[in-house]
């Protein structure tokens, strides 16, 4: 097995490319990332580690612009992300200069996925150890989009999705709670999904909101804290509403069982 373990371009007898699977494992151990598409808004949210007092927090952003109308978040190896983001930005600008038109979200997603796939079958390189969530608005139709790519080079479109740490449980939460929303409700859903895996609340969450009119806006920590407080208040109100109902059920059972 060791031969197939080391070789990037050699399949194992049972059809595995182990280096690609190891890259996917790096994604599963990376920070949690969530993307949610609304009717007029697309939101990216990522888990972030608390920065030291002397570090400039702007230098460790995990959500970046590829173009004015496209943004990307990722889970996995950050150094790999920097290389991939730089290549994608160059492609966006090259396309704009060549055809005098901005790229579509699908076009740049195909480009990124193609790069990731190329690095699974080339000698002297290794697969990118990251999965990306790409959001944006079509420059011609104005329709919002959300795509995901993975280390194998696969890409797909989503209404809402998660990657990184505990992505399965986060995706299950999104499946249960997703509905077509707009504006602030889309932002709240993304933050609620992240709070399923981020224990320390809003201070360890980075959120960016994209609209067609204003492009990408990174939310300040105070704005995130306000939304988290609103979500917690809604949870407390829902729990309080359930308690009288439970008490009534207990009383009803007591009456029915009373001799």
UniProtKB/Swiss-Prot annotation:
<dbReference type="InterPro" id="IPR001353">
    <property type="entry name" value="Proteasome_sua/b"/>
</dbReference>
<keyword id="KW-0539">Nucleus</keyword>
<dbReference type="InterPro" id="IPR000426">
    <property type="entry name" value="Proteasome_asu_N"/>
</dbReference>
<dbReference type="GO" id="GO:0005634">
    <property type="term" value="C:nucleus"/>
</dbReference>
<dbReference type="InterPro" id="IPR050115">
    <property type="entry name" value="Proteasome_alpha"/>
</dbReference>
<comment type="function">
    <text>The proteasome is a multicatalytic proteinase complex which is characterized by its ability to cleave peptides with Arg, Phe, Tyr, Leu, and Glu adjacent to the leaving group at neutral or slightly basic pH. The proteasome has an ATP-dependent proteolytic activity.</text>
</comment>
<comment type="similarity">
    <text>Belongs to the peptidase T1A family.</text>
</comment>
<dbReference type="GO" id="GO:0043161">
    <property type="term" value="P:proteasome-mediated ubiquitin-dependent protein catabolic process"/>
</dbReference>
<keyword id="KW-0647">Proteasome</keyword>
<dbReference type="Pfam" id="PF00227">
    <property type="entry name" value="Proteasome"/>
</dbReference>
<dbReference type="InterPro" id="IPR029055">
    <property type="entry name" value="Ntn_hydrolases_N"/>
</dbReference>
<dbReference type="GO" id="GO:0005737">
    <property type="term" value="C:cytoplasm"/>
</dbReference>
<dbReference type="GO" id="GO:0019773">
    <property type="term" value="C:proteasome core complex, alpha-subunit complex"/>
</dbReference>
<protein>
    <recommendedName>
        <fullName>Proteasome subunit alpha type-7</fullName>
    </recommendedName>
</protein>
<comment type="subunit">
    <text>The 26S proteasome consists of a 20S proteasome core and two 19S regulatory subunits. The 20S proteasome core is composed of 28 subunits that are arranged in four stacked rings, resulting in a barrel-shaped structure. The two end rings are each formed by seven alpha subunits, and the two central rings are each formed by seven beta subunits. The catalytic chamber with the active sites is on the inside of the barrel.</text>
</comment>
<dbReference type="InterPro" id="IPR023332">
    <property type="entry name" value="Proteasome_alpha-type"/>
</dbReference>
<keyword id="KW-0963">Cytoplasm</keyword>
<dbReference type="Pfam" id="PF10584">
    <property type="entry name" value="Proteasome_A_N"/>
</dbReference>
């Amino acid at each position: 097995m060791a031969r197939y373990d080391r070789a990037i371009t050699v399949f194992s007898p049972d059809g595995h490319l182990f280096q690609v699977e190891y890259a996917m494992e790096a994604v599963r151990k990376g920070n949690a990332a969530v993307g949610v598409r609304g009717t007029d808004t697309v939101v990216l949210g990522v888990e972030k580690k608390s920065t030291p007092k002397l570090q400039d927090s702007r230098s460790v952003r995990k959500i970046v612009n590829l173009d004015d109308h496209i943004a990307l978040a990722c889970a996995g190896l950050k150094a790999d992300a920097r290389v991939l983001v730089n290549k994608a930005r160059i492609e966006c600008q090259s396309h704009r200069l060549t055809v005098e038109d901005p790229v579509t979200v699908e076009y740049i997603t195909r480009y990124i996925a193609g790069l990731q796939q190329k690095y699974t079958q080339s000698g002297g390189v290794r697969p990118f150890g990251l999965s990306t969530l790409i959001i944006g608005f079509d420059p011609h139709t104005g329709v919002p989009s959300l795509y995901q790519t993975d280390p194998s080079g696969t890409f797909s479109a989503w209404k809402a999705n998660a990657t990184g740490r505990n992505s399965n449980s986060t995706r299950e939460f999104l499946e249960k709670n997703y509905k077509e929303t707009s504006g602030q409700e889309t932002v709240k859903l993304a933050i609620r999904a992240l709070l399923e895996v981020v224990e320390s609340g809003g201070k360890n969450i980075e959120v960016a909101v994209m609209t067609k009119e204003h492009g990408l806006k990174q939310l300040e920590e105070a704005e995130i804290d306000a939304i988290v407080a609103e979500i917690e208040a809604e949870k407390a109100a829902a729990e309080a509403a359930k308690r009288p109902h439970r008490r009534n059920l207990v009383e009803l059972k007591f009456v029915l069982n009373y001799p």
